[in-house]
């Protein structure tokens, strides 16, 4: 919440939440204000309102502050004292005095701190003085959370770091071979294709020169992309990749792939290609033709691939609980460890690219995965909105930090039909549009052994069952198709004369 979203005249109607904190502060600044300042700065930002009290029923009451000018002066003196607060991220306009119900209150707008400024903490010890905010209020960050903020504050993404304690032997040669085959298919006659494996890996950022011994060693990105799981966990003890299919509610999962199984390498590259086809199987496919050939790859497929890649390249692999992808009957979910490096609002709006692992993103891009401009959350949303009438949902969790993307496949989409579609009226269409659809039905049947069902036609055009029957009736009347069977089992075949 910011001042633009906040209507001071309606203050008593608000409730404290993850972005609004009220404090009585009648005669002075409460000590807890600095914990809230830290928590908002390290979370999504928020408003602190002084001169307001919350009762036991969580109702807000305006009590006002005495000597607001003195309180504002004390506030600025304290926030600019680095013995009290690590960093002042406010501007003059973010602190203001207002009169409500003939009483004066102070409104302090705390923005989300840029990752380079985090953590923002109280006192001089970041481990003891760093806070974050959730719906229950301010909470003290663990050592693990504070160290994660320091990692993200670095101007250089961590996956470019060279691991001088490892050598070429940590890599799975089969993974490298598979990657190079895909690279060569994408880049015909590329100069890198003639290099040996070690030089090739240096060119793509998987290996680099160590400043410690002046020798070539794997980078973090190279280890994650091509390494064996048992080597990866030496650097990332919490590393874990988990894909689950939950297609039967009576059992925990119907299919599972984990990086720790020992049945395959356990690295990111192999994980992506082990699960991507299973992940996109059964997604609704609309009827589309390109050069009279049916197109089976949709914007929904594109969004799912982007979501999987996003989870893998934005994960903090030092974080807990691993990267977990779940496919169920009606949803797909993608969860990865680590906070977002920009605010959720900024990520959703796009325009700012700040990946946690830029080298990993580059390596996937070199083989055509996630290479499009604007790749990321906005791209996922745009692709999904084009394929459906709703957006994926994104949530940020703390303790531990995780980002969760959920795609709901159960809502009505352009690629499918509503479950109550038989009750929908027949749409009025021009004769040209109807003729075009009838021709598409014939072309579809020619490529489908000459057979089609009413349900397929409804799904093909995203129309009601009644509308689909209407198209088929027109073709029947023209003698172009024949009906076989009755009611639910009825199919339609081409009338070959």
Regions found by a protein language model. Name each.
Residues 476-486:
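A short, conserved structural fragment
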Residues 175, 434-451:
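Short amphipathic alpha-helical interface segments
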Residues 418, 458, 471:
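Alpha-helical and His/Cys-centered functional microenvironments
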Residues 414-442:
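Short alpha-helical segments that sit at the start of domains
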Residues 1-301, 306-415, 463, 470:
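Conserved N-terminal catalytic/coupling substructures associated with nucleotide/phosphate chemistry
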